[in-house]
Design a protein with these regions (language model features):
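Non-catalytic helical/linker scaffolds that mediate oligomerization, partner binding
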Residues: 1-469
Length: 469
């Protein structure tokens, strides 16, 4: 079933949700499932996908790629104390040693003295020293190095190809297992996105949506071009706070929201919602509410479902917060704020004027037939204060709409005509509002494609009283 959410929920699949009896309790609260191949084996991830599809085939499956990353290669957890000096060596495979930090970056000898090695998003910090030709690090921030953890280098850019062989293999695996989107890690610029798309074309994956994760200093500098090149973005808040201070990070998020809105792309923000701590949960809930009012499309639970003690409660809580806040935002766009694409000028003007109509006339809902999902996505990005009910024949389109705030989609048959859509839309509105709708309430119907692929379809807007649809 396709349950209606205002902002959308993205959840990471992990052992905490790997039983049908558990997943079935929360699947209606989740729009997109993130599959992370950096941890765990492919057979387990295949099991996750099969289970999701069995319970609800309408969900979007998003594969998380590694990106050009470096990871620890210690076979066991390693305890590091502040001030401790630890040898750092390259290892392609996991090694069993409690006194050396192993990493899978081959050019360790090129890492300059003074470089800060950041393990697991700032959990542990090590300053590189060079002693007699061997790489040694002094622990600046102590902690437990878990197995296969991600490493960043401050003030040093490792020599790595953007799209490595492992990511290529994972993407091919994802296509074979019918994933609908990929979230690409450590994007730096639009060229990285283009490289992903070029590879997707070679493996018959053109339909896969590319969602860029904003988590590098280069991505911050090239934010606008990355948003334009990708199908949407994920804001990694913790990474931003490592890269810059909170004031600048907040400005980055606000700029990203505005630009995504003006060109019609979804923006997703990760969250570490944790209901096990009432005080922490209350503070996190306030942040979520604030971002909802600014126009964030979706919230991604990562650690919350991966290692949290109460993953189901975290999902329920996020869903509750989202639906308490409703659809309305603080945004109000004029035409000068909207990026009109030269190739879609007619569609974009129709969509914008539908949005303005929804602001100026008290309408109850928007019915939006869409072929590629473009019209519904652009409408959603402008954030009208009413639900958008989208109809599409296209599998790729409705999977994408699972990222779009305020959109409830329905798959229709190729034989559907315009009169069918109007009548079904009317019944859906009746159900959606639980009968709380009057005969004189106004409904807007929008279609902005020059291709007549539904018999009797207009290209423009129609405004009806509910009783006249």
């Amino acid at each position: 079933m396709n349950y209606f959410h205002n902002a959308k929920v993205v959840a990471t699949m992990w052992p905490s949700l790997d039983k049908e009896t558990v997943l079935s309790k929360v699947i209606n609260n989740i729009d997109t499932f993130r599959i992370n191949l950096s941890h765990g084996d492919e057979e387990t991830k295949k099991k996750y996908i099969n289970m999701i599809v069995k319970l609800d085939s309408s969900k979007t499956i998003m594969l998380d790629t590694r990106g050009p990353e470096v990871r620890t290669r210690n076979k066991e957890e390693l305890i590091l104390k502040k001030g401790q000096e630890v040898p750092i060596e390259h290892a392609e495979f996991f090694k069993d040693d409690y006194e050396t930090l192993y990493i899978d970056y081959a050019l360790t000898h090129e890492i300059p003295e003074g470089t800060i090695i950041d393990i697991d998003n700032g959990t542990i910090l090590i300053e590189v020293k060079n002693k007699k030709g061997k790489l040694v690090g002094k622990v600046k921030k102590e902690g437990l190095v878990l197995i296969n953890r991600h490493i960043d280098f401050e003030w040093y850019i490792p020599e790595l190809p953007y799209l490595g062989e492992k990511d290529k293999r994972h993407i091919v695996w994802g296509i074979e297992h019918k994933v609908n989107a990929i979230s690409v890690s450590y994007i730096k610029n639009a060229s990285n996105v283009a490289e992903i798309r070029d590879f997707l074309r070679t493996v018959e994956g053109e339909h896969i949506r590319v969602i860029a994760k904003i988590e590098t200093a280069d991505a911050l500098k090239n934010l606008k071009e990355v948003i334009e090149a990708a199908d949407g973005i994920i804001i990694n808040w913790k990474k931003l706070l490592i890269l810059t201070d909170e004031k600048k990070a907040t400005k980055v998020v606000e700029d990203a929201i505005k630009w995504c809105h003006t060109i019609g792309k979804p923006i997703i923000r990760n969250t570490d919602l944790d209901v096990s701590s009432k005080k922490l949960a209350k503070a996190q809930a306030e942040v979520i509410r604030e971002k909802i009012s600014l126009g964030i499309d979706a919230f991604m639970l990562t650690k919350d479902t991966a290692v949290a003690e109460e993953p189901i409660e975290n999902i329920y809580k996020l869903y509750e917060i989202i639906n308490e806040e409703g659809i309305s935002t603080t945004t109000n766009y004029s035409l000068k704020n909207v990026n009109i694409h030269d190739t879609d000028i007619i569609s974009d003007y129709i969509t914008y004027n539908a949005y303005r109509t929804s602001k100026e006339i008290p309408i109850k809902a928007i019915i939006c037939p869409t072929e590629s999902g473009y019209t519904a996505a652009r409408l959603s990005a402008l954030k009208p204060d009413v639900p958008i009910i989208a109809f599409t024949k296209n599998d790729t389109a409705y999977r994408y709409l699972n990222f779009m705030r305020g959109v409830k989609w329905y798959k229709i048959a190729d034989t559907f005509e315009y009169t069918n859509i109007k009548q079904i839309g009317k019944e859906i509105i009746r159900i959606l509002f639980k009968g709380n709708i009057s005969l004189d309430d106004k409904i807007l119907i929008v279609h902005s494609s020059l291709e007549q692929n539904i018999s009797g379809m207009i290209n423009g807007m129609e405004l009806y009283k509910f009783k006249d649809i």
